[in-house]
């Protein structure tokens, strides 16, 4: 069965979706400075996404950026984060436009908005002082309190019996009779699991936590921006929206009473986080980077989460795969080169 793309943070994010965060520790110092050598820059060919689909002008000047944020920024789950995450891909692509490109990455797994604010107050990256722009990926981990609720839902999903799934498809094509009656249990088994997942995400506790996470982010964004402005009043600030890692992960099966609605829950959750990101941009003078919209509209497999019922396979990891990082890099490069 065709793989369905999926969902909350959420963020940075977590071992599970926007709900959980990566568990690998990351240092509070840049894990890289993405400078391309002159030899590397001399080769114009690249598998990286095309930028703006226009002729590349002669390289000139320099570009310096600082990336702040969570596990998405750090590249959690990639085989080689230092070379495959979107900041590294940006450095590679922007090398066709600038003589020197320097991107310092301070992404940390599980980092929340309040933790980023504390980092900027107590140990700000020195690179911010003279950088051209600051790139922020934050918000998903603000819903860490939802971990118990999300874990309950995902545990229920993981308990879906592969044999019941296989028997369901046998049931769907079996002729009426004794054999079909024996397989009918599969409909109830799948419906029960889907119902348990839905109940967790539809609970009052879950919805309250989503709302609170959005309110906290609304309070934190002005403080984060203010700290960056203290360090560098002239730096351009880019704040990326949170994508829905469970896009396409609604599942409806004939004669199964419950529909699995992870896409719906994911969309509702990220909307609460993206609302303040978008609403405050004009007032605070930062640019919103539409990662949420671009992921929704791409139609590609951009995250690790997904469901395949035949063969049976489920992943709820919300982090971008390499293609996801490629798309994020392209979004930034298009914006940056447009104003060059």
Where do the model's predicted regions map?
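Positively charged n-region of N-terminal signal peptides that target proteins for export
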Residues: 1-4
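Bacterial N-terminal signal peptides
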Residues: 8-17
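Bacterial lipoprotein signal-peptidase II cleavage site
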Residues: 18-29
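Serine-esterase "nucleophile elbow" of acetyl-processing enzymes
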Residues: 39-109, 124-128
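Structural recognition of the beta-strand scaffold that forms the well-ordered cores
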Residues: 64-69, 73, 102-107, 132-137, ...
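Oxyanion-hole/transition-state-stabilizing segment in secreted/luminal serine hydrolases
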Residues: 115-212, 244-245
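Active-site segments of SGNH/GDSL-like serine hydrolases
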Residues: 188-208, 222-267
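Catalytic His-Asp segment of secreted/periplasmic serine-dependent ester chemistry enzymes
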Residues: 242-340
